[in-house]
Amino acid sequence: MELAHATPRTLTEGDRALYTALYGSRFALQSGDGFAKHLGFRQSPIDDLLVFHTVFGKSVPDISLNAVANLGYAEGRFLKPAYPGEMLSASSEVIGLKENSNKETGVVYVRTHGRNAAGEQVLSYVRWVMVRKRDAGARVGETVVPKLAACVSPADLAPPHGTDYATLFDTTLSGSPHRWDDYSTGEKIDHVDGMTVEEAEHMLATRLYKNTARVHFNQYTEGKGRFGRRLIYGGHVISLARALSFNGLANAVSITAINGGRHVNPLFAGDTVFAWSEVLDKAEIPHRKDVGALRLRLVATKNRICTDFPDKDDSGKYPADVILDFDYWALRPRKL
């Protein structure tokens, strides 16, 4: 079953400026045209997560408007840069369905595709979401749970053609001298800074993505619900944590794949977000000597600094102040 989502969205320089104002991202590739052109891009591309949130937002009315929770992500691939002035559209195919034991909710698995006006894929990812059944007594068909890769293979990563991340990469302008070669598997990085979430900012951000899920907007209904207040969109947390990761990962200039991710606890306005990262793996990219990939685990907390790298325990249970566990591949320049 495939769903074509309304409506297309042209991303502009204004959208990019607003995204920067919301999160304070400082990565050089998405900040400066001259810097990007030196690497072979035609201009500074739209931030990868702004593309992700825009495509995600297109799917909400058809997939998760009244969702209980967005549960996770897998097999995300950024396939082509998006530039200001380009129009994006989205479609999704249902690839799995599982009824929960309470018979009142179930989990839907979808693969969503984002395309530009030429029909070229710029993004593809899987997510699964818990939704309520319209009729709790209705019979559900056969359970189908898709087999998803634990991570995107380095062979499937897609640095843009015609780019050179190493030769003219200016580490003074980028804010860090450290390249792919300087990181070690198992290394942990505290990103130090914190950022407090405001009610108006997260609603503005969610509207920017045309994400209409009522849990983020409607205090009248959410005030009567489980938490008694509006829930911060999980993507807002991802973008905040990614922006904070500039401290220590300034040259991780592109997200090239999303391996997985979980929103493990809720976030509300007034909470302060901190983050830390762990290097899970390093990979060379076939036929590219200028750029390598780091597999990074980005963990975000609320109201807790990360000097001790707060994490799940041996049983897999997370502390109440850990809110995000996000696994992704990032591109970094290599040493020549």
Regions found by a protein language model. Name each.
Residues 1, 82-161, 269, 276-336:
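HotDog/MaoC-like acyl-thioester-processing domains
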Residues 227, 263, 284-285:
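Generic recognition of flexible, low-complexity loop/linker segments
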Residues 7-10, 83, 205, 266-268, ...:
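Amphipathic alpha-helical hairpins
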Residues 46-47, 79-86, 233, 265-269:
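Short, low-complexity cationic-aromatic patches
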Residues 69-80, 94-96, 254-267, 280:
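A cross-kingdom feature marking solvent-exposed beta-strand/loop segments within repeated
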Residues 1-71, 123, 133-258, 314-325, ...:
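Hot-dog-fold acyl-thioester-processing enzymes
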